[in-house]
Amino acid sequence: MARLHSAVVLALALSSLLTEIAADCDVVSKKQWDGLIPVHVSYLARPVSLVIVQHTVTPFCRTDAGCEELVRNIQTNHMEALQYWDIGPSFLVGGNGKVYEGSGWLHVGAHTYGYNSRSIGVAFIGNFNTDEPSGAMLEALRSLLRCGVERGHLAGDYRAVAHRQLIASESPGRKLYNQIRRWPEWLENVDSIKNA
């Protein structure tokens, strides 16, 4: 019984610490969006030098309540239907211009097979073959990445790529892809990171 009590106390302390880390970068924490506790976690070696941008191919969200509901639904689908340990992306960006904690800065996500243990995956909520990413969404991601560098989660010379460059996918959708490929951190030729 004492062992179980210790494990619960440790889990609560860790959850509190992770909430503080998420809040540190103006991120809506998993606790704030009422997310589930991961079944298991593996830790990323930091700083991470690769950011993979994708989209969720779900409805677009514009309100806090709508985005939180979509993030909860994505997590439930990932954990129940796909048997992931947690929600796949490290972070999600809503149409309300807010960033939602997924697996976060510290944990290995489940967003890009073969790259999860060495990258942060950021998913824009919506289908960006049809939806247009707003300036607020793009700035929310830029702000998150700046904070990640400042806090030592991301390497100062990190590179950003699209999900479609690494696996057979249309993700992050052509409209979002056309925006992010203009960024100075953009890596056009991914040969150097494939199967590294």
From Swiss-Prot:
Induction: By bacterial challenge. CDD domains: PGRP. The keyword Cytoplasm does not apply. PANTHER family: PEPTIDOGLYCAN RECOGNITION PROTEIN (PTHR11022), PEPTIDOGLYCAN-RECOGNITION PROTEIN SA (PTHR11022:SF74). Disulfide bonds join 25-147, 61-67. This is Peptidoglycan recognition protein. GO terms for biological process: innate immune response; peptidoglycan catabolic process. The lineage of its organism: Eukaryota, Metazoa, Ecdysozoa, Arthropoda, Hexapoda. Monomer. The keyword Glycosyltransferase does not apply. GO terms for molecular function: N-acetylmuramoyl-L-alanine amidase activity; peptidoglycan binding; zinc ion binding.
